[in-house]
Curated annotation (Swiss-Prot):
NCBIfam families: PRK08343.1-2. GO terms for cellular component: plasma membrane. Involved in protein export. The keyword Transmembrane applies. Part of the protein translocation apparatus. Forms a complex with SecF. Belongs to the SecD/SecF family. SecD subfamily. It comes from the Archaea. It is found in: Cell membrane. The gene is secD. This is Protein-export membrane protein SecD. It is a multi-pass membrane protein.
Length: 525
């Protein structure tokens, strides 16, 4: 009868009740919200992007906001975007992590990040509209089946100012080409093979003028974007770099020329520490020269002017193109729609590192992490038993550690924290810290029993001493982990968050409850 009263009193103790409430709340949280996993467990992609030039912290925050909107518009979920910025050098890095995506989706996301999203509409060498003049309405994209089964389109409207400028420069020029660019290589030196140079000056880029002669594409590029096109005729790497430097170019683009030349130019730029970006393009299998040129320039069109803008009102235009399959056509349309809808980035980003983990491999990591956690609990149970030779001590210690894990996971589900391998390592570290503190409590209680001290004040003093040690240890751990939380970006944050969470749950919830449970169990002896 006395034992039943003791159990009832224990269960009604406010410290034990608090533990029970936290456990129930955590189980409910995990059931309703569910756990979310980082890319190293759930699978996904991690990309590190670097701005093309140094930016301020405010500009960097603006880029992150635009990227978030762009990826949300694209339909991506479970996005984490973090930034590192050095105010002295201006060097910045953006870390993008996206869970639960396929390899194809990962490649599309990389393209989205590297697309600055600056739209230009040019007519005969004059830019008459940019992205700020464009309005893209919701879901105004898809397949253009009237053109072909695998053709796509993205519709948009021009502002009145851009429309008026277009009227002035295009009046009476039916059939002339309209060029639309998305992120053209502005202020670059473009060195192309003779056949590509001939293609760029051919009728493929001249439209179908009813009267007059439009400027060739090479001339339009020079006037609109300061892109200088040079025909390759056995120039050396030194000649090309010297030419680009003299013209004040930002980029050198080598198209359909020997790869050895590209390697030589790149090495020369690196050796001289020049602020020039070097890129190399070669035609893909089955790609004709017109499509190759359009890919280099990020050119859509050229479209033919089919109406006299001075005689009619039309503000709705569209980007269009084709792809090998319907699925790829829809993907391309959705990508461009996402870029235009979210707006352009302040500077262009270049992905300097990427890591993809398949969901299958992530599931294997999750299984290993679960096994490691169970192994840690069993190890705790056995070590505590061999130390005290009492199951009534070992089982509560291991159970309390399990309760801590459940509560940590419940809170993680509630705040939608992505669990990754460092986070799980933090949980295991918190278990180790918790066991240390429970041993301190147990030793104090056993010390009181060994000395046959029965007075309540003595027991309270021993508990006060134990919790002083526990709180001091917890404070030290929290301070140390706070530095990781504040000053580091990436996986170390997950370790810091779960460790701090585990320590706080321990000192505020599970440790006081364990002390009451241990006092009751030891009193039975």
């Amino acid at each position: 009868m006395a034992r039943k009263k003791g159990v009832k009193a224990l269960l009604l103790n406010w410290r034990v009740l608090l533990l029970i409430l936290f456990l129930i709340g955590s189980v409910v949280s995990m059931s309703i919200k569910g756990l979310t996993y980082g890319i190293d467990i759930g699978g996904g992609v991690a990309l590190i992007a670097e701005p093309e030039k140094p930016v301020s912290k405010d500009t960097l925050n603006g880029i992150i906001t635009s990227l978030q909107n762009r990826l949300n518009t694209f339909g991506v979920k479970d996005i984490t975007i973090e930034a590192q910025h050095d105010p002295e050098t201006g060097q910045s890095l953006i870390v993008v992590k996206i869970a639960n995506v396929t390899l194809d989706e990962a490649n599309q996301i990389k393209d989205l990040i590297e697309s600055q999203g600056v739209l230009y509409m040019e007519f005969n060498g004059v830019i008459f509209a940019t992205g700020t003049d464009v309005t893209v309405h919701s879901s105004d994209y898809g397949l253009d089946l009237q053109e072909c089964p695998t053709c796509w389109y993205v519709g948009f409207e021009l502002s009145g100012k851009a429309q008026n400028k277009f009227k002035k420069i295009a009046a009476g020029k039916l059939g002339w080409p309209i060029d639309i660019y998305l992120d053209p290589p502005v202020n670059s030196l473009l060195v192309v093979s003779p056949r590509v140079y001939q293609e760029m000056n051919s009728g493929d880029f001249m439209g179908a003028p009813s009267e007059g002669t439009p400027k060739p594409l090479v001339e339009r590029l020079k006037e609109a974007f300061n892109i200088t096109v040079v025909e390759y005729s056995n120039q050396t790497a030194e000649d090309i770099v010297e030419n680009a430097t003299a013209l004040g170019k930002d980029k050198i683009i080598l198209a359909d020329v020997p790869e050895e030349l590209y390697n030589d130019v790149r090495e020369l730029v690196l050796s001289k520490d020049l602020k020039l970006r070097v890129s190399h393009y070669t035609p893909q299998q089955g790609e004709d020269l017109k499509d190759f040129v359009k890919r280099i320039l990020n050119l859509y069109g050229p479209y033919v002017l089919k109406f006299d803008p001075a005689k009619g009102e039309t503000t709705r235009l569209k980007l269009s193109g084709s792809a090998p399959t319907k699925e790829e056509a829809l993907q391309e349309a959705r990508k461009i729609y996402s870029v235009l809808r979210s707006g352009s980035l302040a500077v262009k980003l270049h992905v300097v590192s990427e890591e993809y983990i398949s969901p299958t491999l992530g599931a294997s990591f999750k299984k290993q992490a679960i096994i490691a956690g169970i192994g840690a609990l069993i190890a705790v149970l056995l070590i505590v038993y061999f130390h005290y030779r009492r199951w009534r001590i070992a089982i509560p210690v291991a159970s309390t550690s399990l309760f801590e894990v459940i509560i940590i996971l419940g809170i993680a589900a509630l705040i939608r924290w992505n669990l990754d391998l460092p986070s799980i390592a933090g949980i295991i570290a918190a278990i180790g810290t918790g066991v240390d503190q429970q041993i301190v409590i147990t030793d104090e209680l056993l010390g009181g029993t060994a000395g046959r001290v029965t007075r309540r004040m003595s027991a309270l003093r021993r508990m006060a001493r134990a919790f002083f040690i526990i709180f001091a240890s917890a404070a030290t751990t929290i301070v140390a982990m706070s530095f990781l939380l504040v000053y580091f970006v990436g996986t170390l944050k997950g370790f810091a968050v779960t460790t701090i969470l585990g320590v706080l749950i321990g000192v505020l919830v599970t440790r006081p409850a364990y002390a009451e449970i241990a006092k009751y169990l030891l009193s039975l002896e």
